[in-house]
């Protein structure tokens, strides 16, 4: 289903990487006039969302992208696992060719770290110590946002837009020599 400001992609169980590759290519080939919401249903895993955000920002587009995964995070006080690590990536293009790309997962470790043997499954808890409720709240909010738009199964939601301004160069001047999100 596609309209000027909305697209729904059916992953049909495909790897999220492949689905997001096709979605990003589609947005770069036919960018929105202003903004577009893209919903991808039935695709998992999506991997590091900042990669896809950077591709869009390198193409001159603003992007906010989140995706769901199997429930791996419980409430910081204990109980059942209620949400995935549900990353959020935000990418802002820049006329200087160096976009800002923020990519955060809400778990102390990622599930990819567990699969790679770098971390243990019991380390999949909301990050933040005594403030872990904030990471849990964000993860749960993103889970429900995607669930509400996808309608069942795993998926991803992308907001992609043409920028109205170019804030990154001024930020880089103010930041001086500080490393910013997405810098190598």
Can you describe what each PLM-predicted range is?
Residues 1-29:
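Active-site cofactor/substrate anionic-group-binding motifs, chiefly glycine-
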Residues 25-66:
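A glycine-rich phosphate/pyrophosphate-binding beta-strand-loop-alpha-helix module
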Residues 153-184:
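Catalytic-core signal marking the mid-to-C-terminal active-site face
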Residues 71-123:
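Phosphate/diphosphate-binding glycine-rich loops and adjacent basic-rich segments that engage nucleotide
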Residues 102-103, 108-151:
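Small-residue-enriched flexible segments
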Residues 60-72, 143-157:
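Glycine-rich phosphate/pyrophosphate-binding loops
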Residues 9-11, 36-42, 63-67, 92, ...:
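General beta-strand structural signal in soluble alpha/beta enzymes
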């Amino acid at each position: 289903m596609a309209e000027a400001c909305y697209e729904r992609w059916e992953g049909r169980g495909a790897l999220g990487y492949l689905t997001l590759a096709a979605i990003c290519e589609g947005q770069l080939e036919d960018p929105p006039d202003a903004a577009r919401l893209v919903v991808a249903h039935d695709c998992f895993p999506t991997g590091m969302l900042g990669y896809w955000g950077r591709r869009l920002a390198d193409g001159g587009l603003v992007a906010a992208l989140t995706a769901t995964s199997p429930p791996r995070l419980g409430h910081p006080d204990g109980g059942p696992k209620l949400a995935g690590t549900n990353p959020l990536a935000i990418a802002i293009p820049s006329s200087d060719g160096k976009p800002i790309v923020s990519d955060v997962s809400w778990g102390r470790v990622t599930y990819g770290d567990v699969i790679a043997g770098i971390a243990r499954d019991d380390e999949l808890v909301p990050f933040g110590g005594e403030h872990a409720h904030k990471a849990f709240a964000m993860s749960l909010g993103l889970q429900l946002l995607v669930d509400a738009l996808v309608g069942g199964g795993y998926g991803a939601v992308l907001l992609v837009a043409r920028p109205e301004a170019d804030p990154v160069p001024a930020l880089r001047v103010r930041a001086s020599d500080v490393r910013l999100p997405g810098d190598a």
